[in-house]
Regions:
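General detector of folded, globular domains
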Residues: 1-211
Length: 211
């Protein structure tokens, strides 16, 4: 099936949209990086307006791993919201991925950088990992929990409902467009790289002409 995709060429001016979770009404404010048409529907590659957050568990050996979903009870989430609020950070229960905002984010030091490790579903010994900043730490039912700001770019897929409003697609819809969406995201990020190169060239030119 043919997929027709379009990348926002001006990545610094990506349109702001909302990703809606069917059944709950919860919303995730996003910017749209790219879109494609598939079987009469429009799908978008979206990235959150606010910083993406994940909850992690600290193991006895010091490793940080994502918290299992069955442990993410309303009581635990409420405790995480309270721990973040004490640091002037608002933890948002947004769909697909939790997010955070607030002045306290600017006070997070680089020393709080940790590695978050993901188990490999294929059984490979080499686990995936990414850098994350610790926003808050707490104990809940004898469990050491950390609220982490993940640093790698995060993209989610939405299906257009109406202008500026997307909804979380079904698993079948996601499977149908995932590969093309990933390709469009690569093109979008390459646009960011080109803009950075142009900015650096401009700075160097200014220095060359400095009296």
């Amino acid at each position: 099936m043919q997929h027709e995709g379009e990348v926002d060429e001006d990545s610094s001016d990506a349109p702001e949209v909302v990703l809606l979770e069917p059944g709950t009404g919860r919303e995730l404010p996003c910017f749209m990086a790219a879109s494609l048409e598939y079987e009469g529907e429009t799908y978008g590659a979206l990235y959150p307006v606010h910083v993406p957050v994940t909850l992690a568990q600290e193991m006895q050996n010091g490793r940080l791993v994502p918290l299992d979903e069955d442990r993410m009870t309303p009581e635990l989430v409420a405790a995480c919201v309270k721990a973040c609020a004490s640091k002037d950070i608002e933890l948002l229960e947004t769909p697909v991925v939790m997010t955070a905002r607030g002045s306290g984010l600017e006070l997070i030091e680089d020393e709080s950088l940790r590695m978050l490790e993901y188990s490999d579903d294929d059984g490979d010994d080499d686990d995936d990992s990414e850098e994350a900043l610790v926003l808050a730490e707490l104990k809940h039912d004898k469990l050491s929990v950390l609220v982490l700001q993940t640093l790698e770019p995060l993209y989610v897929v939405g299906k257009l409902l109406e202008e500026d409003t997307f909804e979380v697609p079904t698993d079948e819809e996601l499977d149908a467009v995932q590969d093309t969406i990933e390709q469009l995201v690569v093109e979008f990020e390459e646009g960011f790289d080109d803009e950075d190169d142009d900015l650096l060239d401009g700075i160097e030119d200014d220095e060359d002409y400095r009296p």
